[in-house]
Amino acid sequence: MAEAKTHWLGAALSLIPLIFLISGAEAASFQRNQLLQKEPDLRLENVQKFPSPEMIRALEYIEKLRQQAHKEESSPDYNPYQGVSIPLQQKENGDESHLPERDSLSEEDWMRIILEALRQVENEPQSVPKENKPHALNSEKNFPIDMSDDYETQQWPERKLKHMQFPPMYEENSRDNPFKRTNEIVEEQYTPQSLATLESVFQELGKLTGPNNQKRERMDEEQKLYTDDEDDIYKANNIAYEDVVGGEDWNPVEEKIESQTQEEVRDSKENTEKNEQINDEVKRSGQLGIQEEDLRKESKDQLSDDVSKVITYLKRLVNAAGSGRLQNGQNGERATRLFEKPLDSQSIYQLIEISRNLQIPPEDLIEMLKTGEKPNGSVEPERELDLPVDLDDISEADLDHPDLFQNKMLSKSGYPKTVGRAGTEALPDGLSVEDILNLLGMESAANQKTSYFPNPYNQEKVLPRLPYGPGRSRSNQLPKAAWMPYVENRQMAYENLNDKDQELGEYLARMLVKYPEIINSNQVKRVPGQGSPEDDLQEEEQIEQAIKEHLNQGSSQETDKLAPVSKRFPVGPPKNDDTPNRQYLDEDLLTKVLEYLNQEKAEKGREHIAKRAMENM
């Protein structure tokens, strides 16, 4: 029993390394197979290292010739599968049973096998394989089927044949000296005579491959001829197209489309540039037209100024003739002669223009000039005037009252009216100038003399007006350039002052409408009594703050000027007032003030429209 157990144990121990060896071999072969599949370049490089079968046949043929020349020498053993490592390893390891059969072959058998192989190759013409074409070692085309027994090849299973297809990893297997190359081995084995025969064999092989090369050359020549014919046809078409079109190239459709698109883009760019030039010219012409319109307007303004001068001159003549306040009899006789002598064409033309501007019939205008009377009969004597002989002698300082002239010329009836009644006639009933001044906290019109100039600084700058005398020469008059800026500045300052007063009055009226509690408090305090100074101060501060907020929106410069005016606004009863029963402004008075302001605005609008109409005429 013990011997049997030891026998089984030894067998098991011997099987274990055998199993490991088998599994390692299979794993190595599998890994090598996968490596060659993943990297076919490596496989091609290894396959290219084998000699081609034609070279092997040539070497066998040379060996046969050498045997015929030297029969005493033994033929060397050339294995056609010299580069394959797997069969040779198996021959060395375990296939010793086939060696006696191989050794039993004689030289005659070898020669017979080689001759049959060469005859078969000559009978079956094959295309010359490429130099770098990999050769399958077990292919049936290279070797006949009946030669398998002669070459003593072992019948491998299919699994092992797959491994046989792949080349060995190293060429040095089965060589006597692995450090020598193939050409060195051949040089050692062959003599100069064998090399000469080898050259003859290669010449014969070149003759066999000659027809194929000739076929290739013929194909190349035919292809060249075909391409030459195509070039000739293309040139002929080009020549014909150039004759028809007129020298243009026969371009393809894409090139034509590209050229058309480029031309269209160029045309569009040229059109845009032309349009821009036209627009620039139009703008320039428009600017010139605007300048011409400005010149026309200036000429119209000058004409209207001249007309206004003529009208003022005639009106002064009428007033002077009507009043009868001429200085001496010579002036009276001169005025009567002026109206008695016949009118020339220029004066008639001037009268027609005056009647057209004033919208008065010419007959009425002539009657007015002759009689010097007004239709309403309210002729007031003006200040004494010296009648100038020429229109150019009128000083423009006398024409600095455009509002006076407008009020005279543009009344409701179409005839002149005085300046003093212009403001009082427009006031509604029950509302006087004193009420408005009390509302604004100013003095009455009787106690306050309105100064024409806003400040004494401008009054000092005004040049004195020189009286006109008939004997005074033109050299004594001041030039226009010296005193015109002062007159214009004075007029602008006066207009700005009037505008500011009007804006202040309108704003105070709006404040009274917005804060009706001020009026109610005034009505309650009509009974004479002494109000608390703290309440008065609070109300005054509220009103002053509201006025400052309003003025900050417009301009910060007017805030300091208008703050004392707001302080003078009567909120409560005055502290030191001699008239305790002072009348306060009520709602009716406020509505009257608003009506008056609206009426003034409407009159100003009508005057502006009439003035524009006169200028356009």
From Swiss-Prot:
The modification Sulfotyrosine is found at Y151. Binds calcium with a low-affinity. This is Secretogranin-2. Residues 1-27 form the signal peptide. The modification Phosphoserine is found at S174, S268, S432, S532, S555, S556. The lineage of its organism: Eukaryota, Metazoa, Chordata, Craniata, Vertebrata. Keywords: Calcium, Cleavage on pair of basic residues, Phosphoprotein, Secreted, Signal, Sulfation. Belongs to the chromogranin/secretogranin protein family. Residues 123-147, 552-583 are annotated as: Disordered. Its main location: secreted. It comes from the Eukaryota. It is found in: Secreted. One of its GO terms (cellular component) is extracellular space.
